[in-house]
């Protein structure tokens, strides 16, 4: 919640009110993908806890396989939001907000990575102090990158900052999670889909200025 509001606060200080409005609009559309993931995790979290407590040693393998379809659904929703960002923003907002299109696309990539941050390994292991420390690290990274990027690029800088934090922090978070309760992810499928998703959205971002 702090980071969600802090981005806007930093834009307000370091950039213009117009940039704040554009970012706020883009963030609202992109946030639908995170809201979808939050609703979806109410389906699988109870099952994961059950497997963790039932089979403390071998549960990680069944959990990894069980989570793959939910990862598909989450990534697909992020993909739809990113790919159709231009159509959605163009149809539903006045021209002054059309600068939010790229922001929606970038934030959709950032929210896609949050699927891995929703897994409850550290809570199951009782490592709440470690979890708090990791969250504080994430906040500090976000603050530092926001200060550097918003000052130079405005609202786009805030979106890139959120994506950069996701790309750096997610692997760190996953290392600690796997250390305390190992989930046997179907890595090949996940990396292939993430590669397709990121290359598609990045390709669209770079191609947009040349497309009618």
Region annotations inferred by a language model:
Residues 108-137, 177:
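Membrane-interface junctions at transmembrane-helix termini in multi-pass inner-membrane proteins
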Residues 27, 69-81, 135, 156-177:
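Short alpha-helical transmembrane segments in multi-pass integral membrane proteins
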Residues 138-141, 187-212:
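Transmembrane alpha-helical segments of multi-pass transport proteins
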Residues 26-71, 121-124:
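Helix-loop junctions and terminal segments of transmembrane helices
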Residues 23-42, 73-77, 107-114, 165, ...:
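Transmembrane helix-bundle signature of multi-pass secondary active exporters and lipid flippases
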Residues 11-31, 98-101:
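Interfacial/gating helices of multi-pass transporter permease domains
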Residues 2-5, 14-17, 124-126, 152:
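Helix-loop interface residues and adjacent transmembrane-helix termini in multi-pass membrane transporters
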Residues 37, 60-113, 143-151, 201:
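Alpha-helical transmembrane segments of multi-pass membrane transport and lipid-handling proteins
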């Amino acid at each position: 919640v702090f980071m969600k509001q802090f981005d806007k606060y930093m834009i307000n200080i370091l950039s213009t009110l117009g940039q704040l409005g554009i970012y706020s609009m883009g963030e609202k559309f992109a946030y639908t993908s995170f809201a979808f993931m939050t609703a979806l995790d109410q389906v699988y979290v109870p099952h994961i806890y059950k497997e963790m407590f039932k089979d403390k040693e071998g549960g990680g393998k069944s959990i990894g396989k069980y989570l793959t379809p939910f990862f598909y659904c989450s990534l697909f929703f992020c993909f739809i939001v990113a790919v159709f960002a231009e159509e959605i923003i163009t149809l539903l907002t006045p021209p002054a907000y059309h600068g939010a299109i790229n922001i929606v696309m970038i934030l959709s990539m950032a929210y896609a990575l949050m699927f891995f941050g929703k897994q409850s390994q550290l809570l199951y292991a009782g490592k709440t102090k470690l979890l708090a420390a990791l969250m504080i690290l994430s906040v500090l990274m976000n603050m530092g990158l926001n200060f550097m990027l918003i000052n130079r690029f405005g609202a786009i800088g805030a979106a890139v900052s959120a994506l950069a934090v996701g790309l750096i922090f997610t692997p760190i978070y996953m290392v600690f999670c796997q250390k305390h309760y190992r989930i046997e992810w179907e890595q090949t499928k996940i990396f292939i889909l993430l590669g397709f998703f990121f290359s598609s959205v990045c390709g669209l971002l770079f191609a947009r200025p040349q497309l009618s």
